[in-house]
């Protein structure tokens, strides 16, 4: 029989806030302002952020520190499919818009592990129950605070995070191989 793990609410292990409402800070592109990069909905997939899909914006005033993303933060889409991703890089002036939640670890939890958990089926089921029957399937920060996750030993979390990360890398490599084989096949066929 497996050991019984204590469940904790997400708000107990992380500080959760909404991203920045961009149009309150934006300026005309011709005007001088501080330049910021922001995460787009399409840039978040499979627990990763595609840096090529980030957008750039000039801000007429300085953005508060709480909106600036740092290595170790997690962002989560507030609309389906509710994808989460770990910020595993350093990039100055990176912000998340208001259609994302910013999740910062405040307790004995591994950020990478938590990002995988947030993308898991158990969390998806909890989120789907919370938005059931509503016309707009946008989750509120208060919903995220109530999500229940299993408390594990931090060493165990790190082991699971490494394992899951390896699976993701392996899947990504397989996708690349398939793409290269497709290109190779097309090159051969075009020369026949």
Q: How should each PLM-predicted stretch be described?
A:
Residues 11-26, 42-71:
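Sequence-specific dsDNA recognition surfaces
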Residues 94-100, 133-158:
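A short glycine-rich beta-alpha junction/loop motif
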Residues 111-133:
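Glycine- and charge-enriched low-complexity intrinsically disordered segments
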Residues 63-64, 90, 134:
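A structural connector/turn signal
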